[in-house]
Amino acid sequence: MKLTKTLLAGAILAGIGGTAYAETSVTLYGLIDVGITYQRGKVGTEDANRGQYGGDYQSRIGMTDGIQSGSRWGLRGTEDLGDGLSAVFVLESGFGASNGNSKQGDRLFGRQATIGLNHESFGRLDLGRQTNIASKYFADIDPFSLSYLNSTMGSAFSAANTVRYDNMVMYQTPSWSGFQGGIGYSFSTDDVEGPTGFEEDDNNRAITAGVRYVGGPLQVAFTYDQQFRAPSQPQPQQFILGAAYDFEVLKLSLAYGRTKDGVFVGQDFDLMGGAVNPNTPAKGLGNTNDRFTWDGLKVNSYLVGVSAPIGGASNVFASWQRADPNKGLENMDIYSVGYTYDLSKRTNLYAVGSYADGAAFVEGNKMTTVGVGLRHRF
């Protein structure tokens, strides 16, 4: 199957670009994920910093894209340049399986579009649109792999909420006895994913960095992210420290983070009718995927998670996470449990449930989410 995909992708590129060389390998890959989600939410009481909310419970049920993993297709290529050096590229496009629409702001390759060089001894350099270091290093520590709707670790740790930047130069070292580091700089984040996203002429910049250790059953990661906006505006920043240990029968995950002066990517809790006052400093917090700054905002974040295999085809996982803000905002607690069942090596069923109390940092906001779905990788 992999050989067929590689040959097919190579034939496509050869037809587009001319001669294909034997030392070049191109792989076509992807996955499709779609499910059904039920949500029941209660919009909380009035908050002086966020505007007026109602107090009724509301619910809905419908088809949802990418509960476990965002649907995508991509091309991954490498060319051997000799002496351990290779040219590499990744072009990855996100889409919604329920309607066929493009994701990531209707970009053609919104998930990733990079070209770079990789050396066996000196590491890898990538240029283009890609995720930050935190989203790379904590995907294996979070029991929910930074996915599954509100169950993602990114709900409480916004710098790990699959943050993507345009115009990024990123260097990652090779693994030295299990240790690896990385640093990236975006010359213009150019975010267009939300209605208040960054415009190109804003020239907002960002830095992302981290180190991790992966050895046997132990994983440890530390990351730091900061965004640089106009000099008169706050500069959001967050560090995250996390670890996971696999006891074979159970994998335990722990993380702590601290955010200052804003949110990198807010989780969309979709409070079904609760409208944030657009004139308040906290606009967009929790209800959209927008980034925002708020001078003096501080949020301490915590995660405790577990995962365990059941037989040879099933896994169960759970987590508790808390985001504890200042500014008189409400603590947010999220309790989650998930389950996967492998039908084959490439196809699986899944189920997930989560309960958020104090969602979007507002007293009385409650959100229950239950989803089931099917994922196929190719």
At which residue positions do the language-model features occur?
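Outer-membrane beta-barrel "beta-signal"
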Residues: 341-343, 366-378
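Gram-negative bacterial Sec-dependent N-terminal signal peptides
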Residues: 1-22
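Repeated loop/turn-to-beta-strand initiation elements of outer-membrane beta-barrel proteins
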Residues: 85-87, 121-125, 178-181, 217-222, ...
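Outer membrane beta-barrel
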Residues: 23-38, 48, 58-188, 212-219
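Residue-level signature of outer-membrane beta-barrel architecture
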Residues: 77-79, 117-119, 173-174, 213-215, ...
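Hydrophobic, lipid-facing positions within transmembrane beta-strands of outer-membrane proteins
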Residues: 69-73, 111-115, 165-169, 205-209, ...
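Detector for outer-membrane/organellar transmembrane beta-barrel domains
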Residues: 202-336
